[in-house]
Amino acid sequence: MAIKDLDLKLQPDSVSISNINFDQLNSHVVIAEDGVMNVASLVKSDEAEVAEPEVQESQKAETKPFPISIDTVSINDGAVTFIDNTMSPRFTTKLSHFKGAIKGLSSAELARADVDLNGRVDDVAQLSVTGKINPLKGDLYSDIKIRFEGYDMTAVTPYTGNFIGQAVDKGQLDLDLGYRVSERELIGENEISLDQFTLGRDIKSEDAVDLPVGLAIALLKDANGRIDLSLPVRGNLDEPEFKISKIVFKALFNVITGIVTSPFKLLSNLAGGDQELDKVAFVPGELNMVSGHQTRLESLAKALTQRPQLRIEVRGMFDQDRDVQALQQQKLATFFELSEQVTFADLKLSSIEAKLNKQLGKEALTSIKAENMVLPEGANEKAKPELDVEAYRFALYESLLKAQPVTDDELRELARSRASQIRNYLVETEGLSPERVFIMEAEADDSANEAGVLTVFQLSVD
């Protein structure tokens, strides 16, 4: 280290330095197994050895900050080795070829020093630090941008193994970090880009988060194998448990949690809309989707094209009330050979009676007729009852409708046909690979969804 042009003055007090130069500075930052950093230990030791003399309150009030100014702090070919022994295996990385300058350091009010530093991490990744700082004032200020390019992600396996229970098989990391501290408030923007990030072997870890990380990666990774994430962070430096790493990890955890708990919301955003892409509704008893739901499939296919590692699982469903009623109506229409031109109201009453007699028997017909015999309006009790023809016709219709059998097999076949129709559309019309679309076992739809009978989607990872 070399100091150039040091000027110390007393009464009034001041220190000014033209240049402090660090040439080939080599240091180690080590985190012990108990989490204590070697730098922090040194600071605590120094503080313990220095006993502050007793000072009267009046003297404290008169004490003023010692004015300091340093024109330039230059660094040439520096190196820092970082070792984290809290991980198993331990994590080691080295910052080398570190050079640059900090210009304009001063304890003056509103002073801002310019920072321009750069180096290489593990001899490959490029690191640059630029911005403005003011570390010599009690009111800490910084506005720093950190650019990190081409870092080999396999090196962070000790961390991924600990936190997610898997090694990194391959991948490169780019970071654009922006951190601003003013009035003890931290505002940070983290732009993270991962290229070809792939997890590998499993690693046993009691601290691993219980999240479907593989699904999260597949949801985030685009068709070119890149993942881009924005992580804004906020914090106050005076908070007792403030740690920037803790804040960033919490933000990352929240992002991943939000993605895996609402994956179709992310797909909807990719498709440029706000539709519910996790389901479509069908007209009861039919293979026709309700109005507007076809566009959901178009948007879903568009999003899945951008996320090639995802598979879509299609589960057709049936409604034991609405589908049954609709199928019974269809069977009754076939039974009477009804059409748009010939409705049930057009049928002769005798024809309806004959059909009911054939299907339900004479006793049922007699019973229905008896139930619809009423006294003429205004007649006394001794008058002869007459047949209420309209009520009788409706009762015949209802009885015949309920008599049309709809089996569980028919309902499940309807649900499977709905799922097959969706699969065919996604594959044949939208061009998704057949290996990415799976039909699941049919289930009953108990949602009573107003739109219609649902077919629902789930996501899995290739």
Where do the language-model regions lie?
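Secondary-structure transition motifs
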Residues: M1-H97, Q196-G214, L237-N254
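Beta-strand-dominated lipid-handling architectures at cellular/organellar boundaries
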Residues: A2-K9, S14-S16, V36-V43, T81-G161, ...
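A short linear-motif detector with a strong N-terminal bias
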Residues: M1, D7-L8, P53-E54, K60-A61, ...
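Extended terminal
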Residues: L8-D13, S18, F66-I68, N134-R147, ...
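Hydrophobic beta-strand residues in large extracellular and virion-surface proteins
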Residues: V73, V115-L117, I312
